[in-house]
């Protein structure tokens, strides 16, 4: 059964960058971290921005999937595990969005000493992260800039019928 959204939220590259820089600012001082763990794929871009802003060069990645394009699944698939740490101590786990919280709950069990942050958070998953920048309604489908294609739109003038 497919997941249906009543609302849509479109994020531009500029908006994402601004929100992620704010997320990074909240994580200062940077010296408290040994490295960053990006949650692939959505957390890759935010993790790169956080890495740059905090001047942290050690960046690992964990690939966990709970989505199949537009449908959320209950089962999680680990496609690449973390190699930089065993318990997450001193690491900042970065993702784009916490939705149901299933992915973050799963990662918290594996990395109990890490700090977990996301750019966006929905009510069902908020308690699974330590910090986030903006909250969204649970029934909102978020469109990230890497999921969209830019195209030309005809001006309104001349389209009157």
From Swiss-Prot:
Keywords: Cell inner membrane, Cell membrane, Glycosyltransferase, Magnesium, Membrane, Metal-binding, Purine salvage, Transferase. It comes from Idiomarina loihiensis (strain ATCC BAA-735 / DSM 15497 / L2-TR). 5-phospho-alpha-D-ribose 1-diphosphate binds at residues 41-42, 95-103. It is found in: Cell inner membrane. Purine salvage pathway enzyme that catalyzes the transfer of the ribosyl-5-phosphate group from 5-phospho-alpha-D-ribose 1-diphosphate (PRPP) to the N9 position of the 6-oxopurines guanine and xanthine to form the corresponding ribonucleotides GMP (guanosine 5'-monophosphate) and XMP (xanthosine 5'-monophosphate), with the release of PPi. To a lesser extent, also acts on hypoxanthine. Pfam families: Pribosyltran. This is Xanthine-guanine phosphoribosyltransferase. Mg(2+) binds at residue 96. GO terms for molecular function: guanine phosphoribosyltransferase activity; hypoxanthine phosphoribosyltransferase activity; magnesium ion binding; xanthine phosphoribosyltransferase activity. Xanthine binds at residues 99, 142. Gene3D superfamilies: 3.40.50.2020. PANTHER family: XANTHINE PHOSPHORIBOSYLTRANSFERASE, XANTHINE-GUANINE PHOSPHORIBOSYLTRANSFERASE. The lineage of its organism: Bacteria, Pseudomonadati, Pseudomonadota, Gammaproteobacteria, Alteromonadales. InterPro entries: PRibTrfase_dom, PRTase-like, Xanthine_Guanine_PRibTrfase. One of its GO terms (biological process) is GMP salvage. The gene is gpt. GMP binds at residues 99-103, 141-142. Pathway: Purine metabolism; GMP biosynthesis via salvage pathway; GMP from guanine: step 1/1; Purine metabolism; XMP biosynthesis via salvage pathway; XMP from xanthine: step 1/1.
